[in-house]
Amino acid sequence: MSKKAFLFPGQGSQYIGMAKDLFEKSVEAKEMIKTADDALGVNLSYIMFNGPEEQLKQTEYTQPAIFLHSVILASLIRTLQPEASAGHSLGEYSALVSANAIQFYDAIKLVRARGRAMQQAGIDNPGTLAAIVGLEPQKVIEICKESSAVGIVQCANFNSPGQIVI
Protein backbone atom coordinates (compact mmCIF):
# COMPACT_ATOMS: atom_id res chain seq x y z
CA MET A 1 0.00 0.00 0.00
CA SER A 2 1.41 3.37 -0.96
CA LYS A 3 1.09 6.42 1.23
CA LYS A 4 0.18 9.81 -0.17
CA ALA A 5 0.83 13.36 0.93
CA PHE A 6 -0.35 16.72 -0.36
CA LEU A 7 2.42 19.33 -0.62
CA PHE A 8 1.48 22.97 -1.12
CA PRO A 9 3.59 25.79 -2.63
CA GLY A 10 4.54 29.09 -1.13
CA GLN A 11 4.44 32.49 -2.75
CA GLY A 12 5.78 32.85 -6.27
CA SER A 13 3.73 30.24 -8.13
CA GLN A 14 1.01 32.68 -9.21
CA TYR A 15 0.15 33.35 -12.86
CA ILE A 16 -2.57 35.13 -14.82
CA GLY A 17 -5.37 32.70 -15.57
CA MET A 18 -4.79 30.55 -12.50
CA ALA A 19 -7.86 28.46 -11.56
CA LYS A 20 -9.88 29.84 -14.49
CA ASP A 21 -10.20 26.39 -16.07
CA LEU A 22 -11.36 24.97 -12.73
CA PHE A 23 -13.91 27.78 -12.35
CA GLU A 24 -15.30 27.02 -15.81
CA LYS A 25 -15.43 23.21 -15.41
CA SER A 26 -16.18 22.54 -11.75
CA VAL A 27 -19.21 23.60 -9.74
CA GLU A 28 -17.24 23.00 -6.53
CA ALA A 29 -14.37 25.22 -7.70
CA LYS A 30 -16.80 27.93 -8.80
CA GLU A 31 -18.47 27.89 -5.36
CA MET A 32 -15.12 28.10 -3.55
CA ILE A 33 -13.98 31.00 -5.72
CA LYS A 34 -17.23 32.88 -5.17
CA THR A 35 -16.97 32.22 -1.42
CA ALA A 36 -13.44 33.65 -1.43
CA ASP A 37 -14.53 36.76 -3.35
CA ASP A 38 -17.36 37.30 -0.85
CA ALA A 39 -15.20 36.64 2.22
CA LEU A 40 -12.53 39.07 1.07
CA GLY A 41 -14.84 41.75 -0.27
CA VAL A 42 -12.71 41.94 -3.39
CA ASN A 43 -13.03 40.38 -6.83
CA LEU A 44 -9.97 38.16 -6.37
CA SER A 45 -11.16 35.86 -9.15
CA TYR A 46 -11.02 38.72 -11.67
CA ILE A 47 -7.43 39.49 -10.65
CA MET A 48 -6.51 35.79 -10.86
CA PHE A 49 -8.14 35.26 -14.24
CA ASN A 50 -7.33 38.57 -15.95
CA GLY A 51 -4.67 40.45 -14.04
CA PRO A 52 -3.12 42.86 -14.42
CA GLU A 53 0.03 40.94 -13.53
CA GLU A 54 1.37 43.80 -11.40
CA GLN A 55 -1.72 43.59 -9.20
CA LEU A 56 -1.55 39.79 -8.93
CA LYS A 57 2.12 40.12 -7.89
CA GLN A 58 1.13 42.28 -4.91
CA THR A 59 1.46 40.09 -1.84
CA GLU A 60 -2.00 41.00 -0.54
CA TYR A 61 -3.48 39.37 -3.68
CA THR A 62 -0.79 36.79 -4.45
CA GLN A 63 -1.15 34.94 -1.19
CA PRO A 64 -4.93 34.45 -1.20
CA ALA A 65 -4.80 33.58 -4.92
CA ILE A 66 -2.22 30.82 -4.45
CA PHE A 67 -3.97 29.59 -1.31
CA LEU A 68 -7.33 29.47 -3.10
CA HIS A 69 -5.93 27.64 -6.12
CA SER A 70 -4.15 25.11 -3.91
CA VAL A 71 -7.18 24.41 -1.74
CA ILE A 72 -9.42 23.98 -4.77
CA LEU A 73 -7.03 21.45 -6.30
CA ALA A 74 -6.76 19.56 -3.02
CA SER A 75 -10.53 19.51 -2.68
CA LEU A 76 -10.98 18.17 -6.20
CA ILE A 77 -8.57 15.27 -5.59
CA ARG A 78 -9.47 14.60 -1.95
CA THR A 79 -10.52 11.04 -2.86
CA LEU A 80 -6.79 10.25 -2.92
CA GLN A 81 -7.01 10.46 0.89
CA PRO A 82 -3.54 11.69 1.82
CA GLU A 83 -1.96 10.56 5.07
CA ALA A 84 -0.28 13.93 5.45
CA SER A 85 -0.43 17.51 4.22
CA ALA A 86 2.46 19.96 4.30
CA GLY A 87 3.29 23.30 2.78
CA HIS A 88 6.12 25.73 2.30
CA SER A 89 5.48 29.05 4.05
CA LEU A 90 2.11 30.21 2.67
CA GLY A 91 1.43 26.59 1.70
CA GLU A 92 1.11 25.71 5.38
CA TYR A 93 -2.32 27.36 5.38
CA SER A 94 -3.47 25.19 2.46
CA ALA A 95 -2.16 22.15 4.32
CA LEU A 96 -4.17 23.12 7.41
CA VAL A 97 -7.37 23.36 5.36
CA SER A 98 -6.57 20.09 3.58
CA ALA A 99 -6.13 18.40 6.97
CA ASN A 100 -9.42 19.90 8.24
CA ALA A 101 -7.57 21.78 10.97
CA ILE A 102 -9.09 25.13 9.92
CA GLN A 103 -12.13 26.06 7.86
CA PHE A 104 -11.67 27.43 4.34
CA TYR A 105 -13.70 30.60 5.01
CA ASP A 106 -11.59 31.50 8.06
CA ALA A 107 -8.33 30.59 6.36
CA ILE A 108 -8.90 32.74 3.25
CA LYS A 109 -9.44 35.80 5.46
CA LEU A 110 -6.40 34.93 7.55
CA VAL A 111 -4.25 34.51 4.44
CA ARG A 112 -5.40 37.90 3.10
CA ALA A 113 -4.49 39.54 6.42
CA ARG A 114 -1.11 37.79 6.29
CA GLY A 115 -0.52 39.02 2.74
CA ARG A 116 -1.44 42.59 3.66
CA ALA A 117 0.85 42.52 6.71
CA MET A 118 3.73 41.15 4.68
CA GLN A 119 3.18 43.70 1.92
CA GLN A 120 3.20 46.53 4.47
CA ALA A 121 6.33 45.12 6.11
CA GLY A 122 8.05 45.26 2.72
CA ILE A 123 7.05 48.91 2.33
CA ASP A 124 8.16 49.80 5.86
CA ASN A 125 11.42 47.84 5.62
CA PRO A 126 12.50 47.74 1.98
CA GLY A 127 14.89 45.01 1.00
CA THR A 128 15.23 41.97 -1.17
CA LEU A 129 15.94 38.27 -0.93
CA ALA A 130 18.39 36.13 -2.86
CA ALA A 131 18.93 32.37 -2.81
CA ILE A 132 22.56 31.29 -2.50
CA VAL A 133 23.09 27.84 -3.97
CA GLY A 134 26.11 25.61 -3.49
CA LEU A 135 28.04 27.38 -0.72
CA GLU A 136 28.61 26.01 2.75
CA PRO A 137 26.48 27.71 5.41
CA GLN A 138 29.51 28.97 7.34
CA LYS A 139 30.89 30.64 4.19
CA VAL A 140 27.56 32.40 3.55
CA ILE A 141 27.47 33.58 7.18
CA GLU A 142 31.01 34.98 6.84
CA ILE A 143 30.18 36.79 3.58
CA CYS A 144 27.06 38.28 5.17
CA LYS A 145 29.10 39.58 8.11
CA GLU A 146 31.64 41.17 5.75
CA SER A 147 28.91 42.70 3.59
CA SER A 148 27.11 44.12 6.61
CA ALA A 149 29.79 46.80 6.81
CA VAL A 150 27.91 48.65 4.03
CA GLY A 151 24.33 47.60 4.82
CA ILE A 152 22.23 44.93 6.44
CA VAL A 153 22.93 41.52 4.93
CA GLN A 154 22.00 38.42 6.85
CA CYS A 155 20.93 34.82 6.45
CA ALA A 156 17.15 34.72 6.38
CA ASN A 157 16.48 31.03 5.87
CA PHE A 158 18.41 27.80 5.54
CA ASN A 159 16.19 26.07 2.98
CA SER A 160 18.40 23.02 2.57
CA PRO A 161 22.06 22.09 3.00
CA GLY A 162 22.76 23.55 -0.45
CA GLN A 163 20.44 26.58 -0.47
CA ILE A 164 20.48 29.57 1.86
CA VAL A 165 18.33 32.67 1.46
CA ILE A 166 19.92 36.01 2.37
Feature names for model-found ranges:
Residues 87-88, 158:
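Conserved alpha/beta-hydrolase "nucleophile elbow" surrounding the catalytic nucleophile
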Residues 18, 59, 96, 129, ...:
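Generic anion/oxyanion-binding catalytic loop in active/binding sites
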